[in-house]
A protein has these predicted regions:
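General small-molecule cofactor/ligand-binding pocket signal
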Residues: 16-18
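Single conserved hydrophobic/aromatic residue that forms the stacking wall/gate
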Residues: 1-11
Length: 171
């Protein structure tokens, strides 16, 4: 505290201490939040954060593979150090004040030889072009871990099963 106050004086900034926040008998910390996310406990993560866990970003062009299998996606690139969770999730997305349900894959897309982390979101009943626009993705339920499939046909079949389950979970 003394070092912080001293630096605050040097840089003409106000420094104050805050009390430790306790939730369910344990200290709230970034480690505890990450652990909740890794366990896909989004309710606990939201309680610890004081808001839902949301990933926000601008939609970028991908390789358009989703369109070829009738599952177009909005892609958000993720810096490697930001990949706090991975897998397939039922999600809720906010775009221009409207809420949409969907399914998302957070990871590297091993079936198609992906290397860079990306968040791919397929929104149900949505066809708009939103490249360059911001969306907010709220993770609701984990459906499964990301995995490499033997072929694109097997991936497509699994995606349809994932979509069906996500729709049930989001009702």
């Amino acid at each position: 505290p003394e070092l912080s106050r001293g630096l605050g004086d040097v840089y003409k900034r106000q420094v104050s201490n805050t009390e430790t926040v306790i939730f369910e008998g344990k200290r709230v910390s970034s480690t505890r939040i990450r652990e909740a996310l890794l366990k896909s406990d989004f309710n606990l993560a939201a309680s610890l954060l004081g808001r839902p866990y949301i990933y926000s970003g601008k939609v970028v062009y991908g390789n358009q593979l989703g369109r070829t299998i009738n599952v177009p996606t909005a892609n958000l690139w993720i810096p490697k150090q930001k990949l706090s969770i991975s897998g397939v999730y039922a999600v809720s997305c906010m775009h221009k004040g409207a809420n949409y349900k969907g399914i998302a894959n957070m990871g590297v897309r091993p079936t198609v030889g992906g290397e860079q982390p990306v968040l791919e979101v397929h929104l149900f009943d949505f066809n708009d072009e939103i490249y360059g626009q911001r969306i907010d993705v709220e993770f609701k339920f984990k459906i499964r871990d990301e995995k490499k499939f033997e072929s694109l046909a097997f991936l497509k079949e699994q995606i349809q099963k994932d979509i069906s389950l996500a729709k049930k979970l989001l009702q």
